[in-house]
Amino acid sequence: MSDKKRVLILCTGNSARSQMAEGLLRHDAGEKFHVESAGTKPGSVRREAIAVMREAGIDITGHPSKHVDEFAGQQFDYVITVCDNTRETCPVFFGKAEKLHRDFEDPAAATGSEEQRLAVFRRVRDELRVYLDEFARRRNVNNAR
């Protein structure tokens, strides 16, 4: 049996924010956390998210986009919502999990040139990393970075 704490990260589409957050937390503190992500209306993982994570040395190419219902009945230590919409519609079946929330800009809504859109994805990736580093630090987990 693993002593890793179980973390579920939720956003609407499970295509950008929660996918990047899953990749970051697995990479930076995966020895302490078993991390999953899901969405309330999942779509495909955004190519921009894959690209900016690759720039950070993290490969999320094979991450599937999952619906939150796939985790019904499973126990988690932490459920983190990374968008206001999902916080409001978050299922109640996560029992005693500690629920945390921070709204991050949706990079999938970015407009402009490809470079301008990638800049938004990079900024959100970096904001997620700071948030998740603090999440792990407060739980006495030394990140691997």
Predicted regions and their residues:
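Phosphate-binding/catalytic loops
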Residues: R87-R145
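Conserved small-residue
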Residues: N14, M53, V79-I80, L128
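Alpha-helix C-terminal capping/helix-to-coil transition sites in glycosyltransferase folds
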Residues: G73-Q75
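A generic structural signal for alpha->beta connector loops
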Residues: K32-H34, D77, K96
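Conserved active-site segments centered on acidic
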Residues: M1-D69
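Short, charged/polar surface micro-motifs in flexible loops or helix N-caps
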Residues: D59, N85-T86
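Short, charged/polar "capping" segments at the starts of alpha-helices
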Residues: G43-V45, T86-T89
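Redox-cofactor binding/interface segments in oxidoreductases and associated redox assembly factors
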Residues: T81-V82, H101
